[in-house]
Regions:
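Hydrophobic, small-residue-rich transmembrane alpha-helices and their short perimembrane loops
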Residues: 1-72
């Protein structure tokens, strides 16, 4: 039972930030498409803004690995 709870915690540590990242990237992507259509010189900034929410998933993955390694 303990290993199942650790696996659940690790899955939630990655899954919840992944859902939040998907929502944020959808909003940023749609706004970015409109911005780049009007001002093409902002494409570099929009790529950076699109990548920023990915840090949530990366940090969630790190937390999941730490959970698995600490209790395994």
């Amino acid at each position: 039972l303990e290993k199942a709870l650790i696996a659940l915690a690790a899955a939630l540590a990655v899954g919840i930030p992944a859902l939040a990242t998907a929502y944020a990237q959808a909003k940023i992507g749609s706004a970015g498409a409109g911005t780049v259509a009007e001002k093409p010189e902002t494409s570099g900034i929009m790529i950076i803004l699109e990548a920023i929410p990915e840090t949530m998933v990366i940090l969630g993955f790190v937390v999941a690995i730490m959970l698995i390694l600490q209790f395994a």
